[in-house]
Amino acid sequence: MSSGIILLIVAIVLLVIIAYLVGVIIRKRNDSLITSLEERKQALFALPVNDEIEEVKSLHLIGQSQTSFREWNQKWVDLTVNSFADIENHIFEAENLNDTFNFIRAKHEINSVESQLNLVEEDIASIREALNILKEQEEKNSARVTHALDLYEKLQASISENEDNFGSTMPEIDKQMKNIETEFSQFVALNSSGDPVEASEVLDRAEEHTIALGQITEQIPAIVAKLEDDFPDQLDDLETGYRRLLEENYHFPEKNIEARFQEIRESIRANSSELVTLDLDRAREENTHIQERIDSLYEVFEREIAAYKVAAKNSKMLPRYLAHVKRNNEQLKDEIARLSRKYILSETESLTVKAFEKDIKEIEDSTLAVAEQFGLQEKPFSELQVTFERSIKTLTNVESGQMDVFAAVKDIEKIESQARHNLDVYVTQLHMIKRYMEKRHLPGIPQDFLSAFFTTSSQLEALMDELSRGRINIEAVSRLSEVATVAIANLEDLTYQVVQNATLTEQLLQYSNRYRSFEAGVQSSFEHALRLFEVENDYQASFDEISYALETVEPGVTDRFVNSYEKTREHIRF
């Protein structure tokens, strides 16, 4: 055999071996792919879709939800019955083709199975997602329905437990509860018939009505308690108190109290009847008006009770106080009469005492008997309180006025005595001033001093004349005494001033001799001042003239003389 043939055979054998090896490799690779596809199929088949379907089925879906569930359930059945069986057949076919080294057809089958698995995966994901949505939606709807039903049941239980607290509103509350129950039944019917939108609206209304009725029932007991318990109790208390007060001889300015009791009871009954409409705002407002009317009756009774305490106290005090003030007035009249015999008094005191007597007489006539027979009166104590307080106030004013009049007349005799004493003193002082001036040996007395002296003397004479009358005008005495006091004080000051001016002028005239010979101004002022001093007796002008001239030549000289004089000045010895 030639070497060429051998080489050909070897080449063919090698090709066969290589082809076999390639086939084995491709077969193993396909086996691996087929195994992977089988595992994917098993994994998909093992998903808990059936459990999820059963879980959703147990929710007892209705309406559109139930229709949707059936569609997805049928899709799952189709997958398990048809798609998985078809995939299984293709896998089996791919295995046979791969085992017979029909790799091209095997590859085609593998690709087909892979595509089918991809579609199945998507379908299963859609099914599971839809089931989950149905489950969540149903749970949400169920929770909403459960919440609404819980509200209703709690409201029903609350109403049942507190039925006695709702009074006349109970029939209307029962009616509202039945309406809500009807709405729940309507919701179930609509939901079952596949109309979830309208069913949801009905459920919303049922829940809103439940909440609203719950809020109303929370407020009703307080209103009913007022109408059925508080107001009747207060009225009973008022009527009992009213009868007791009448037995204790109380009287009232209001004559319609019994009618007001009846009107309030009618208002309570009317409000209870109107409450069945559940118009709570109106009921509360009417309750407020009823309470205000009850409170006004309490105020009437409390006012009279408080007035009794004050009036009873004042009824005991008034007669004693009246007697005291009347006694004071008699004493004051006697004192004024006694003083009038010696003094001319102001008419004001007499008129005032007469006015006091009139006020006292009016209280004696109008109020004294009422106070003394206080327990037998048939007037409201509040009116008696006002009457007594007005009378006591009048007596207080009278007593205060009496004290003022007494203060005005009690010092009349002292005023006279003091005026006589002052007159004696002032007359003595006038004589001492005259002697004091005479001892000065002045060239003459200034006219202003003479005028003041004789005026003061006249005023003392006027006071003396007034004190010498048979009936003394005490007001005139007081006035003249004050005038005399001022006049004598002014005269004393003027006396000191005249003497000081005269003395200082003499001293300065003598001192000016130092300058007269060589100071023409001093000489001229000396001559002028001397004429004023000796001829005109104007000591103030003379002092001003000479002191001015000396100050021009010797500043401070005047002050030196003035200071020296003030230290040695002789005082009038009274």
Curated annotation (Swiss-Prot):
Residues 1-7 are extracellular. This is Septation ring formation regulator EzrA. It is a single-pass membrane protein. It is found in: Cell membrane. Residues 102-141, 274-350, 459-520 form a coiled coil. Residues 27-574 are cytoplasmic. Keywords: Cell cycle, Cell division, Cell membrane, Coiled coil, Membrane, Septation, Transmembrane, Transmembrane helix. The chain crosses the membrane at residues 8-26. Negative regulator of FtsZ ring formation; modulates the frequency and position of FtsZ ring formation. Inhibits FtsZ ring formation at polar sites. Interacts either with FtsZ or with one of its binding partners to promote depolymerization. GO terms for biological process: division septum assembly; septin ring assembly.
